[in-house]
Swiss-Prot record:
The active site is at 683 (proton donor). L-methionine binds at residues 420-422, 473, 588. It comes from the Bacteria. The gene is metE. It catalyses: 5-methyltetrahydropteroyltri-L-glutamate + L-homocysteine = tetrahydropteroyltri-L-glutamate + L-methionine. L-homocysteine binds at residues 420-422, 473, 588. This is 5-methyltetrahydropteroyltriglutamate--homocysteine methyltransferase. Pathway: Amino-acid biosynthesis; L-methionine biosynthesis via de novo pathway; L-methionine from L-homocysteine (MetE route): step 1/1. Belongs to the vitamin-B12 independent methionine synthase family.
Amino acid sequence: MTTIKTSNLGFPRLGRKREWKKAIENYWAHKIDKAELDQTLTDLHKENLLLQKNYHLDSIPVGDFSLYDHILDTSLLFNIIPERFQGREVNDDLLFDIARGNKEHVASALIKWFNTNYHYIVPEWDNVEPKVEKNTLLERFKYAQSINVNAHPVIVGPITFVKLSKGGHQSFEEKVETLLPLYKEVLQSLVDAGAEYIQIDEPILVTDDSESYEDITRKAYDYFANEGLGKYLVIQTYFERVHLKFLSSLPVGGLGLDLVHDNGYNLKQIEDGDFDQSKALYAGIIDGRNVWAADIEAKKQLIETLQQHTQQLVIQPSSSLLHVPVSLDDETLDESIAEGLSFATEKLDELDALRRLFNDNDLSKYEHYKARYERFQSQSFKNLEYDFESVPTHRKSPFAKRKQLQNQRLNLPDLPTTTIGSFPQTREIRKFRADWKNNRITDAEYQEFLQNEIARWIKIQEDIGLDVLVHGEFERNDMVEFFGEKLQGFLVTKFGWVQSYGSRAVKPPVIYGDVKWTAPLTVKETVYAQSLTDKPVKGMLTGPVTILNWSFERVDVPRKVVQDQIALAIDEEVLALEEAGIKVIQVDEPALREGLPLRSEYHEQYLEDAVHSFKLATSSVHDETQIHTHMCYSQFGQIIHAIHDLDADVISIETSRSHGDLIQDFEDINYDLGIGLGVYDIHSPRIPTEEEITTAINRSLQQIDRSLFWVNPDCGLKTRKENEVKDALTVLVNAVKKKRQESESTTA
């Protein structure tokens, strides 16, 4: 058998304890200067590279590290600058402004990266002049060489980059052709600098419509081959299966395939002879998206199968390790569960164990991981019985009747205003929560602090003039982690952070066992907030689909079963809130769209299961109780009918960064439930103008019945500063008041 090699597609940027996030946010807050930021990030990049080197990888990725987002990096590399930001020097401050917006200009759109919880900044092609502006990829490659790291450069490929872009008058094919000479310039510079191969990521080739652009894909890679670059290129794909016969026909040196999330299709195509054995096979055999340890015996058998179909086998994670935490080393977890976990460094060590086994006949690491896996699997985490059939999955009455009863009960004005749920998580709030968790303050002291914050923000909302209030979620570190801490069957780590967008990090809980509600989760804070005001206060919950999608899910039972277990737990909390007198309850599902499978053949079942779980969680209440939900970051065209099927009394949707595109989705459906299309972007510190809010409202009312329309920001306000929140919400309420006055004068 031939020697196998090991490689990696990408590594977490955050650092073990979020050093990356803290440095960038300190720079934004003017607490450090650019020189200190650069030094901190250089040190972290070096640490990441050397850490990977410790696991004896034959090649280590460079170009995956970024100050914000690798797609935005590619935009700046090729001078694809949004028109409103043009005319400035291409540097890191420009990058941050495109991503976050500034006082003069809105940020670029923020979209989910395929079906993950990572987000990328959408490239904009309007009136651009593509050119290689600053070859930062070459700089990073040379840096890796300077510290004696055997690295391979990583760049997103032209097909994926253009497909994820928007704007411009050129066709898709014309944009690709425009970029090819620029890609050639960058790729040639890397080869000239000594790159043995270049990882060119084309995950778009796993999607449904990839066959419709096979011609331009072939044209692109034929071009690179004719320029003498083909043999240096390894096309990496991940998250799903590919059309392997086509991909193998491209004139490149190697192909990377996901052999974890492909539902077995990629392996079958290999076994059917569709892989060109003259190429290197980069086999994604270790799960890059979940945190469970590999069944190393099964991986050994898979490698033995793959060796029959290629002379050049490289084993790697199934995708970039961007989607998992850095290391288990700093965790203090129950060993019985920890033995079943594997973060980024552990996944690299699993690869090293397999490399040693096959190349050196060294069984030590292999036997270690095999024993750990067998001990973990010997435990039983399936020990609860569920009565799914006894819980209703439909509201008692149709929406029209519910709306009438809710209008009488709530007595809200025309164009009611609200927020999505969270208010700023200040340093003081985080400190109090940390002090409480570490027993540095008493329960009573912590509760007093929370009540003071809730009372302060109830008054702020009343003073601004909002119609439906929220308690602010000051007791919550994260909208999923909070529930993971309180529901049976979840494990919450201490340092299990992953990047969501920009400097935003989340700490997904790990679902290891059966899920159960054991006590009220949110009732105390919500009831206290309601006691302070005559206006309705929303109960704020996270929905079952989002909790599952934003957790590391267990793999020993079907996904639908876990999702419905969570739904029953949320149903218990919904009923507890209703019984406590809460009239409006929001069950957020921001991640419903992101979990949609990349292949359409799986869409119907996914959406059917998602709708069922949401209704399982929300249908037990009385007609008078108003159920809200919220979604964000998404392209909704594919799921608009499923959104309607949720039968939520009101849905709020992020739309501001789509620059109005989302409203087009409502032209094909007569949406007859309550809806709020977010009227300003909370991801940017920029304060909207009344004119912008009014324009957003007017545009929405062209498609949405006024009696159904709500006005709200597009997401929670957790990451904003207090003055930004107050100023923006004041603008929003003033704009709505003027719209109401216009209506009154028209009907007078």
